[in-house]
Amino acid sequence: MPALTKAQLAELLFEKIGLNKRESKDMVDAFFDLVADSLLKGEDVKISGFGNFQIRTKAPRPGRNPRTGETIPIQARRVVTFHAGYKLKEQIQDQELVPLAP
């Protein structure tokens, strides 16, 4: 399944808003830098109509080596989570389902 890249996002900004290509790329880079910086400071990032990004700490837990069956400890870690906002969920539900290409 294709994915939207930062370069494609910058190109779409160039086409839709009329910024030059350099400004579009800089804007996309700055946006993601600001999101990452806020998360690194422990702040949630809430984008109205889109969703929320936040850092969550996962507790340590026992894991299992699939080859040997040996129990191994999995360290505590921090992960980024995204929760889609109501408007985004609604837009996705309103879209007609398109079958994925094989």
Swiss-Prot record:
Citing just one GO molecular function, the answer is: DNA binding
Q: Name one GO cellular component term.
A: cytosol
GO biological process terms on file: DNA recombination; positive regulation of metabolic process; regulation of DNA-templated transcription; regulation of translation
Using the record, list the residue span of the signal peptide; answer none if the entry has no such feature: none
Q: Respond yes or no to whether keyword Metal-binding is given for this record.
A: no
Q: Which cysteines are joined by disulfide bonds?
A: none
This protein's UniProt keywords:
DNA recombination, DNA-binding, Transcription, Transcription regulation, Translation regulation
The record's annotation in CDD domains points to:
IHF_A (cd13835)
**Highest taxon of source:** Bacteria
Give the matching InterPro entries. Answer: Hist_DNA-bd (IPR000119), Histone-like_DNA-bd_CS (IPR020816), IHF-like_DNA-bd_dom_sf (IPR010992), IHF_alpha (IPR005684)
Q: Which Pfam families match?
A: Bac_DNA_binding
Note the NCBIfam families from the entry.
himA, PRK00285.1
What HAMAP family does the annotation carry? IHF_alpha
Q: What does this protein do?
A: This protein is one of the two subunits of integration host factor, a specific DNA-binding protein that functions in genetic recombination as well as in transcriptional and translational control.
Q: Which family does it belong to?
A: Belongs to the bacterial histone-like protein family.
- Self-association and partners: Heterodimer of an alpha and a beta chain.
Protein name as annotated: Integration host factor subunit alpha
The organism of origin for this protein? Albidiferax ferrireducens (strain ATCC BAA-621 / DSM 15236 / T118)
Q: Which gene encodes it?
A: ihfA
